[in-house]
């Protein structure tokens, strides 16, 4: 199982409290189910994207000031692509990750690790 969380579940971003709380709950559910279902051979992981270029984000990213703010907070200095999230999900479904469970993989260009 691969859940789709968000960096909002791990730190404050301007998506609102309800969104952040729901993603934090999903991250915790991932960890708990990974432990509960491990004996049955079920792995449960999560991906946590930061800014990903999609139809939903295109309007916000079209604003040069907002785009610059996103880039300034992203060590890789770019937004992610949907294919990169899909590749992370695919990895978590492959035998190559057979010993990985309970993890929330940030697909965020380093956003969660970036300090001031």
Residue ranges of predicted features:
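Alpha-helical segment proximal to the catalytic Tyr-Lys
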Residues: 35-39, 98
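Short, flexible catalytic-loop segment of classical short-chain dehydrogenase/reductase
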Residues: 10, 27, 44, 48-59
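A glycine/serine/threonine-rich, flexible loop-to-helix segment
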Residues: 39, 51-74, 114-116
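A conserved structural motif in NAD(P)-dependent oxidoreductases
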Residues: 74-85
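Short C-terminal tail/terminal secondary-structure segment
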Residues: 11, 90, 101-116
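Active-site helix of classical SDR
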Residues: 22, 30
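Residue(s) in the substrate-gating loop at a strand-loop-helix junction
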Residues: 6
């Amino acid at each position: 199982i691969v859940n789709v969380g968000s960096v909002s579940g791990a730190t404050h971003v301007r998506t609102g409290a309800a969104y952040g709380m729901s993603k934090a709950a999903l991250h915790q559910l991932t960890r708990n189910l990974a432990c509960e279902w491990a004996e049955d051979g079920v792995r449960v992981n999560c991906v946590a994207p930061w800014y990903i270029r999609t139809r939903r984000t295109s309007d916000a990213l079209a604003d040069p000031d907002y785009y610059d703010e996103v880039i300034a907070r992203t060590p890789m200095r770019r937004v992610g692509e949907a294919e990169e999230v899909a590749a992370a999900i695919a990895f978590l479904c492959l035998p190559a990750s057979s010993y990985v469970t309970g993890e929330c993989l940030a697909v965020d260009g380093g956003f969660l690790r970036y300090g001031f």
